[in-house]
């Protein structure tokens, strides 16, 4: 039997209108059967993917109709939806679902007994619309009671009443659709008439606007004509004034031509000057590059000087340690000398047994013993410190040659810490015979250094008794010409370090003690030999040469700025 069609305005119709918007716009009637099938497909596809599983559709129909999977009609539907036998993986889209379900419903109507199932399916579709979308309880018949509170299979009488009311609503819907179509046609006719009237009004407005524009144009032309007349009179006056200005401009042009010739001559002179300035700028650029290279070389030399200075500092520290060791050794030698003196005094029974001359010579020999070697070593160290302090930065000023020579000669004298009588050796002579002689400067020539070394060796030789000593002969120090030049700005003229001449070994050691020992018959020779051996050991263990710094050879370039 044919199922009645439901109203378009119901919830099922709304769902169908969402699925088929074209048919709803055209006002095509939708059957109740198609609405039920759409509701069934929507219930099985809550995610709106467009495809549902065949097993899900069968489970939904089993839950709605209350039939088991062994039902022959459901098995026939399963075979129709899954003709390839894919099993649980089989899916079907909406169009295929509608076609298969219509064929299946028609086949069931031919065999009869489908009215109850259709009514039950329709009631299940309505119930599924009331349930929330995507709820798994819609697929189980036991959970449907929790939403509606009743069994999903209502009574047959209530279902028949509902179907009859749906048929009435569908008939009224068809009548409303016909009336709506008539109203739409009349509305379209009215809209066409209104459009024609609007076009006519627009044409009239255009004509009115063109007429107004023509009138305004005529007025504007009249005003413009008056303006042109006035302008013509003013132009005539301007023409006369322009003629006078043209004659004046010709005179000015002749004057400007003369000025232009003068400017061209000046321009030629300026071009020549520009060429000269360019050449001068190139020369200055070359000088700048040369100065940059010299500056780089000076910086490199300063770095080397700092490195050498650090090495000299380490050497000074090591020399300080060596000096401390020498002090300890000197103290031990001093104790040994005192012990030997005691032994020497014990070799005789008493001072009364010695001859009077021997006693006097002994007293003189005791009084004229050499001073402490520690004082001499301290004096040498002070001299080295002063010489180190005199080393100046080669880039920070002028090396004062004359002052260095005088200062060096003054520093050669040892500080006298003895009594007013002075320090004397065994023979009553001054302990430092070289005090009256200037110490050779570090800037002496090689020949002068050799002569000084020979004089030192000659002074160190033993002098026979009664012979005049070299130190007793007055000797004038050689005079050296000192350059007295103004302190001026310096620039380096060499690209390498100039080593400073070092002193000879004889100049760096302690000043030798020129001893003239009187052979006393009571003093044994081994004791004198031991004393000489001690003095030689002190001379050999003297301090190392003082540290020197590298200096640049500089020349005067220009006076320094004041």
UniProtKB/Swiss-Prot annotation:
Residues 125-153, 407-481 are annotated as: Disordered. Its main location: nucleus. The chain crosses the membrane at residues 522-542. Residues 1-521 are cytoplasmic. GO terms for biological process: actin filament organization; chromosome localization to nuclear envelope involved in homologous chromosome segregation; double-strand break repair via homologous recombination; homologous chromosome pairing at meiosis; meiotic telomere clustering; oogenesis; spermatogenesis; spindle assembly. Core component the LINC complex which is composed of inner nuclear membrane SUN domain-containing proteins coupled to outer nuclear membrane KASH domain-containing nesprins. SUN and KASH domain-containing proteins seem to bind each other promiscuously; however, differentially expression of LINC complex constituents is giving rise to specific assemblies. At least SUN1/2-containing core LINC complexes are proposed to be hexameric composed of three protomers of each KASH and SUN domain-containing protein. This is Protein KASH5. It comes from Homo sapiens. The gene is KASH5.
């Amino acid at each position: 039997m044919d199922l009645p069609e439901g109203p378009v305005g119901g919830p099922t119709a709304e769902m169908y209108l969402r699925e088929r918007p074209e048919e709803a716009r055209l006002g095509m009637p939708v059957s109740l059967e198609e609405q039920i099938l759409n509701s069934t497909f929507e219930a099985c596809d809550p995610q709106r993917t467009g495809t549902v599983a065949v097993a899900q559709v069968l489970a939904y129909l089993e839950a709605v109709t209350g039939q088991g999977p062994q039902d022959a009609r459901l098995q026939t539907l399963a075979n129709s939806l899954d003709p390839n036998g894919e099993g649980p993986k089989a899916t079907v889209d909406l169009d295929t679902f509608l076609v298969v379900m219509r064929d299946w419903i028609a086949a069931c109507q031919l065999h009869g007994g489908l009215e109850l199932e259709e009514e039950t399916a329709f009631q299940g579709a309505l119930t599924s619309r009331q349930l929330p979308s995507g709820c798994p309880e819609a697929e189980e018949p036991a959970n449907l009671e929790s939403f509606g509170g009743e069994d999903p299979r209502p009574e047959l009488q209530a279902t028949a009443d509902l179907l009859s009311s749906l048929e009435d609503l569908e008939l009224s819907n068809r009548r409303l659709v016909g009336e709506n179509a008539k109203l739409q046609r009349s509305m379209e006719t009215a809209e066409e008439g209104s459009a024609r009237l609007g076009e006519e009004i627009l044409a009239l407005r255009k004509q009115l606007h063109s007429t107004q524009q023509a009138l305004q144009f005529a007025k504007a032309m009249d005003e413009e004509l008056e303006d042109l007349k006035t302008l013509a009179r003013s132009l005539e006056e301007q023409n006369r004034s322009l003629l006078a200005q043209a004659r004046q401009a010709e005179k000015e042009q002749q004057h400007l031509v003369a000025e232009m010739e003068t400017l061209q001559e000046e321009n030629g002179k300026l071009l020549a000057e520009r060429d000269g300035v360019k050449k001068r700028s190139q020369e200055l650029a070359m000088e700048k590059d040369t100065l940059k290279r010299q500056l780089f070389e000076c910086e490199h030399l300063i770095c080397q000087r700092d490195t050498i200075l650090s090495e000299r500092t380490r050497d000074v520290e090591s020399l300080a340690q060596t000096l401390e060791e020498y002090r300890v050794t000197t103290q031990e030698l001093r104790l040994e000398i005192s012990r030997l003196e005691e032994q020497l005094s014990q070799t005789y029974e008493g001072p009364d047994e010695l001859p009077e001359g021997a006693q006097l010579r002994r007293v003189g020999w005791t009084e004229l013993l050499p001073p402490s070697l520690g004082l001499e070593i301290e004096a040498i160290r002070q001299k080295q410190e002063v010489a180190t302090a005199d080393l100046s930065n080669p880039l920070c000023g002028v090396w004062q040659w004359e002052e260095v020579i005088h200062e060096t000669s003054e520093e050669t004298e040892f500080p006298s810490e003895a009594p007013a009588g002075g320090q004397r050796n065994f023979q009553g002579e001054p302990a430092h015979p070289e005090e009256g002689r200037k110490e050779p400067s570090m800037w002496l020539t090689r020949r002068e250094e050799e002569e000084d070394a020979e004089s030192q060796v000659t002074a160190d030789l033993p002098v026979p008794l009664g012979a005049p000593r070299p130190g007793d002969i007055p000797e004038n120090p050689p005079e050296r010409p000192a350059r007295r030049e103004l302190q001026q700005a310096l620039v380096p003229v060499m690209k390498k370090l100039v080593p400073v001449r070092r002193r000879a070994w004889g100049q760096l050691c302690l000043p030798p003690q020129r001893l003239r020992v009187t052979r006393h018959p009571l003093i044994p020779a081994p004791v004198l030999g031991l004393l000489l051996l001690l003095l030689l050991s002190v001379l050999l263990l003297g301090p190392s040469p003082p540290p020197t710094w590298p200096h640049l050879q500089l020349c005067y370039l220009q006076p320094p700025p004041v």
